Each structure stands twice: as structure tokens, then as C-alpha cells.
């Protein structure tokens, strides 16, 4: 059984259960002659059980026959960090210059567990350090052990 020839990949961040033919989805898929309505329906069906509006990084694989498949990744670390810190946006200046909120080390560990499939490590401690680094670059202070 031969595999289909891949025409290209499209990387988008799409809100859960919120795929519409409007930009950026419509133009990105239209350029590659993909059935936009079919993608939107499939994506919305796949994300139906999730909280509406969560940003989901999605990799769409487009094949030569204009068919497609897609892989939904976990929401960005920044989404979880903002949720745990109860803030709407990160600091405009980075690191310790302007602290806009706090997260605990346990929060970072919990986020790391959720993000493990998409991080380039299998070690929970290394994943926690990655999340702590993201928190610091957003202007969040990590408290606790």
C-alpha cells in the first residue's frame, strides 16, 4: 500500500470548535485547493468536546490529490500560564523588569504534564524548566520550590 504524495504543510493556531472559512483558515487552505468547508467541519467535530475558544496549534498535511489530514497539538504554554496566573496578557518587557503575575512551581509542573506530548523532552523536570522559562519570559514570577 503506497502513501499519498504530500503537497505541503500548513501550521495554524485555530480556536477549539471555531474553525470558519474566514482568514486565516480560508486563504491558507484555498491556496492549496483544499475543501475549506470539509476541513472546518472535520476540525470542529474533532474539537467539539473541548472548551470553546482554546487556541489549538494545528498542523494540516495537504496531499497532491487535494485531500488533507490534520494533527491537533496541545494549547500553547502561554495560554496555560495566563490562565493559572489569572492575567490577560504577559509583560511587554521581559524577565524581572516588570512582574505581571505569579505562578507556583506546582502550576509549572502541572502545565508541563499537559504539554509533554509537544515538548522535546521525556523528563518531567526538564519539561518543568521549559515551562518556567516561558513564564519568566512572559514576566511571571515562579514561586515555590
Curated annotation (Swiss-Prot):
Disulfide bonds: none annotated. Pfam families: Ribosomal_L11, Ribosomal_L11_N. Coiled coil: none annotated. One or more lysine residues are methylated. GO terms for cellular component: cytosolic large ribosomal subunit. InterPro entries: Ribosomal_uL11, Ribosomal_uL11_bac-typ, Ribosomal_uL11_C, Ribosomal_uL11_C_sf, Ribosomal_uL11_CS, Ribosomal_uL11_N, Ribosomal_uL11_N_sf. Keywords: Methylation, Ribonucleoprotein, Ribosomal protein, RNA-binding, rRNA-binding. One of its GO terms (molecular function) is structural constituent of ribosome. GO terms for biological process: translation. The keyword S-adenosyl-L-methionine does not apply. Belongs to the universal ribosomal protein uL11 family. NCBIfam families: L11_bact (TIGR01632). Forms part of the ribosomal stalk which helps the ribosome interact with GTP-bound translation factors. Part of the ribosomal stalk of the 50S ribosomal subunit. Interacts with L10 and the large rRNA to form the base of the stalk. L10 forms an elongated spine to which L12 dimers bind in a sequential fashion forming a multimeric L10(L12)X complex. This is Large ribosomal subunit protein uL11. It comes from Rickettsia peacockii (strain Rustic).
Amino acid at each position: 500500500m503506497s502513501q499519498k504524495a504530500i503537497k505541503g504543510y500548513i501550521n495554524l493556531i485555530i480556536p477549539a470548535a471555531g474553525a470558519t472559512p474566514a482568514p486565516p483558515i480560508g486563504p491558507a487552505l484555498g491556496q492549496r485547493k483544499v475543501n475549506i468547508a470539509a476541513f472546518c467541519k472535520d476540525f470542529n467535530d474533532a474539537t467539539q468536546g473541548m472548551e470553546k475558544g482554546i487556541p489549538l496549534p494545528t498542523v494540516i498535511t495537504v496531499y497532491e490529490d487535494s485531500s488533507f489530514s490534520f494533527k491537533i497539538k496541545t494549547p500553547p504554554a502561554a495560554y496555560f500560564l495566563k490562565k493559572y496566573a489569572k492575567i490577560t496578557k504577559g509583560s511587554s518587557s521581559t524577565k524581572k523588569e516588570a512582574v505581571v503575575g505569579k505562578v507556583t512551581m506546582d502550576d509549572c509542573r502541572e502545565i508541563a504534564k499537559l504539554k509533554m506530548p509537544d515538548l522535546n523532552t521525556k523528563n518531567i523536570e526538564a519539561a518543568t524548566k521549559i515551562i518556567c522559562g516561558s513564564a519568566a519570559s512572559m514576566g511571571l514570577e515562579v514561586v515555590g520550590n
